[in-house]
């Protein structure tokens, strides 16, 4: 199916000195990272495609102006992060769909492992909630959902972090 309208990319930021850590966060999400050493690097959502214009993430270092604003936020973000942890589905987020339930589970397991065992990622990335399609508290009955929080990459203030909804759909749409 040819589509004229689509989401082309999401631009995310990382803290100074954390470019490699940001690339690792994308890899944990199942993306393929390509870094040409320019201002930004690319993370492909579909690991089989190399379309630099569609269906991807870009990541670059947060500008000094943003970091100054974030420094002024002091403890104001702590309550926000706690709200996000309690109800991630009610926070600003974007969704990322994977192709198989096995891939969904593997990504979740890898993120949990990194959040517990990786010194650089402990406290920086975590699975906030799982909502299987057949659970009594399912948000959606047509997909399994996992909500992931990280402050390694974000499309807004790094201090507040980024919520990413990882989805596996029971029925794939026709191509």
What name fits each language-model region?
Residues 1-3, 5-17, 35-37, 43-45, 51-52, 72-112, ...:
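Vicinal oxygen chelate
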Residues 11, 18-20, 46, 61, ...:
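Glutamate identity and glutamate-enriched acidic tracts
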Residues 22-29, 106-115:
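Short amphipathic alpha-helices in soluble, non-transmembrane regions
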């Amino acid at each position: 199916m040819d589509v004229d309208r689509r989401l082309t990319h999401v631009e995310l930021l990382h803290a100074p000195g954390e470019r490699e850590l940001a690339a690792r966060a994308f890899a944990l999400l199942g993306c393929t990272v390509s870094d040409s050493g320019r201002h930004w690097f690319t993370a492909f959502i579909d690991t089989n495609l190399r379309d630099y214009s569609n269906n991807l993430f870009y990541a670059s270092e947060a500008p000094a102006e943003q970091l100054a604003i974030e420094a002024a936020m002091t403890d104001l973000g702590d309550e926000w992060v706690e709200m996000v942890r309690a109800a991630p589905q009610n926070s600003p987020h974007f969704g990322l769909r994977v192709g198989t339930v096995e891939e969904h589970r593997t990504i979740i397991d890898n993120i949990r492992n990194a959040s517990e065992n990786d010194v650089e990622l402990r406290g920086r990335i975590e699975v906030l909630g799982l909502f299987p399609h057949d659970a009594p508290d399912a948000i959606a009955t047509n997909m399994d959902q996992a909500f992931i929080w990280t402050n390694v990459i974000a499309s807004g203030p790094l201090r507040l972090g980024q919520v990413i909804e990882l989805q596996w759909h029971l029925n794939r749409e026709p191509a």
